[in-house]
Amino acid sequence: MGKKYIESAKLVDKNTLYAPDEAVDLVVKTSKAKFDETVELAVRLGVDPRHADQQVRGVVILPNGTGKKVRVLVFAKGDKAKEAEAAGADYVGAEELATKIQSENWFDFDVVVATPDMMGVVGRLGRVLGPKGLMPNPKSGTVTFDVAKALTEIKAGKVEYRVDKTAIVHVPVGKSSFGAEKLKQNFHALMDAIVKAKPASAKGQYVKSVALSSTMGPGIKINPVKVLD
C-alpha cells in the first residue's frame, strides 16, 4: 500500500454511509495521485441480470462531460462519411476498417457509430467488438443515420451504462480535476438516469449499494436511501 493511499484512507470511515454530496467532497480530497484521476461510480442493483426483462442499460449526457478525449470510429459511406468527418469523427470508413480490425486486432478507438446500412459489415465484427462493449446499438444511439448528432453527443460527454453479470453498474463520473461541484452535477445526472431505468419486473430494493472512488483512492460508501431523495 502506498503512503498516499494510507493518508487518503484515514479520511474515510469505512463503516459510514455518506450523503452523496459529502462523498463527492471526500473523493476530491482523497485524490492525491500525480495524474488526473478518474472518479468512478459503482451501483449495485436489486435485479437479476440473467433475465432479459431485468437488464438495466441506457445512455446519459453528463452535464460536464467525462474529461476524457473520446476516439470515435464511424462506419459510413458517401455523404454520411463526409458528414461524419465534418462532425469530428476520428476514423471513418467501411469494409476496409472492418478488415483492419479483424486482421490487425486494431482497437485505437473508444466508441463505434454505424449507419444502419453498414450493419451487414459491422455485424461480422460482433465477436470482437461485443466483448469489448464496442458493438454499435440502436438503443444507445450508435446505429443511426444522424451521425453528426451522435458524434456531437458522444464528444460532449455521453456515457453508456449497463448492469454487469454481478448486478453492478460501473461508470465514470468525471476527473478529479473537475472539482466537487461539477462532479456532483455529473453524479446526480447518472443516478437519476439509473433510477429511471428501473425494470418493471424488478422486485424489492432497487438501489442496494452505491460507492464512489478515484483511480488510486479508497472506496467511499454512499447511503442508497439518500440517493433517492
UniProtKB/Swiss-Prot annotation:
Respond yes or no to whether keyword Protein biosynthesis is given for this record. no
Q: Which InterPro entries match?
A: Ribosom_uL1_bac-type, Ribosomal_uL1, Ribosomal_uL1-like, Ribosomal_uL1/biogenesis, Ribosomal_uL1_3-a/b-sand, Ribosomal_uL1_CS
Task: For this UniProt record, give its keywords in alphabetical order, as a comma-separated list.
Answer: Repressor, Ribonucleoprotein, Ribosomal protein, RNA-binding, rRNA-binding, Translation regulation, tRNA-binding
Gene3D superfamilies from the xrefs? 3.30.190.20, 3.40.50.790
Q: Name one Pfam family in it.
A: Ribosomal_L1
Q: Tell me the Gene Ontology biological-process terms attached to this UniProt entry.
A: regulation of translation; translation
Which Gene Ontology cellular component annotation is one that this UniProt entry carries?
Answer: large ribosomal subunit
- KW Nucleotidyltransferase (keyword) present: no
Q: Which Gene Ontology terms cover its molecular function?
A: rRNA binding; structural constituent of ribosome; tRNA binding
Taxonomically, the superkingdom here is Bacteria
Q: Say what the protein does.
A: Binds directly to 23S rRNA. The L1 stalk is quite mobile in the ribosome, and is involved in E site tRNA release.
Family indicated by similarity:
Belongs to the universal ribosomal protein uL1 family.
Q: Which PANTHER family match?
A: 54S RIBOSOMAL PROTEIN L1, MITOCHONDRIAL, LARGE RIBOSOMAL SUBUNIT PROTEIN UL1M
Per UniProt, subunit arrangement is: Part of the 50S ribosomal subunit.
**Mind telling me what this protein is named?**
Large ribosomal subunit protein uL1
Q: Which organism is it from?
A: Clostridium acetobutylicum (strain ATCC 824 / DSM 792 / JCM 1419 / IAM 19013 / LMG 5710 / NBRC 13948 / NRRL B-527 / VKM B-1787 / 2291 / W)
Gene of origin?
rplA
